[in-house]
Regions:
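Predominantly transmembrane beta-strands of Gram-negative outer membrane beta-barrel pores used
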Residues: 13-14, 21-43, 47, 57-65, ...
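Outer-membrane beta-barrel transmembrane strands
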Residues: 15-31, 39-40, 154-201
Length: 214
């Protein structure tokens, strides 16, 4: 995997990021009632492998003017579904840039892209922090010949770590306005904002982290 021709490992690691956005809206009504509906979605593929983003947004609005304008009703609902997968990490251990900057330009990273993992032998141990675990004979471990804290194969990080965050959000608003006499109104408002947030973080134990100091 050593080469006499200098390689641009950063350029070869990253992909072309792409982002797509689509929207559609419909509205209509009369003097006393109007309706509005819209849908929008965004999908994106990041510059790093397996990094994706998607977002869906539904919006509905309705208003009424009743009883010769003595009662006005307004209602809106907004639903948002959003999912992010494998957002690039900062720091050192799980940040592929850390290793890409450290590896020499005489290393052909295409080899480690095609061979980012290997099967553990009897001599292979895994260490997480200051704790050493039993040997993982026959299990996948990262193929990376250089030892060092936080120093990991960037292609192993892309293929063998997974994180996601899913967000479902519902926003409701309602207003009722009653005209009592000219210049005097009574108004009631309702609002609700509810969010469900789910996070997943998975990683293989052979990722090298900095040993904790006592």
């Amino acid at each position: 995997y050593f080469t006499t021709e200098p390689r641009d490992n950063l350029k070869e690691y990253f992909n072309l990021g792409m982002n797509f956005t689509n929207t559609i809206a419909i509205n209509g009504g009369s003097e006393n009632a109007r309706s509005y509906f819209s849908y929008g979605n965004t999908t994106a593929n990041g510059v790093m492998k397996n990094n994706t983003f998607s977002r869906h947004n539904l919006m509905f609005k309705q208003n009424f003017i009743l009883f010769n304008k003595y009662l006005k009703l307004d209602f809106s609902a907004n639903y948002i579904n959003q999912k992010m997968e494998n957002v690039p990490m900062s720091g050192e251990a799980r940040n592929p840039l850390y290793s890409l900057y450290k590896v020499g330009r005489d290393v052909d990273m295409r080899y480690f892209k095609a061979n980012y993992k290997r099967v553990a032998q009897t001599v292979d141990d895994i260490t997480l922090g200051s704790v050493q675990y039993k040997r993982l004979l026959g299990q996948d471990i990262q193929n990376w010949p250089w030892a060092g804290e936080n120093y990991n194969n960037p292609y192993w990080l892309a293929e063998k770590t997974y994180s996601s965050r899913s967000i479902n959000r519902l926003i409701l608003n309602g207003t009722a306005n009653v005209k009592i006499i000219e210049g005097l109104n009574f108004q009631v408002r309702y609002s609700r904002d509810q969010t469900f947030d789910k996070n997943i973080d998975q990683r293989y134990a052979t990722i090298r982290f900095k040993t904790k100091e006592s």
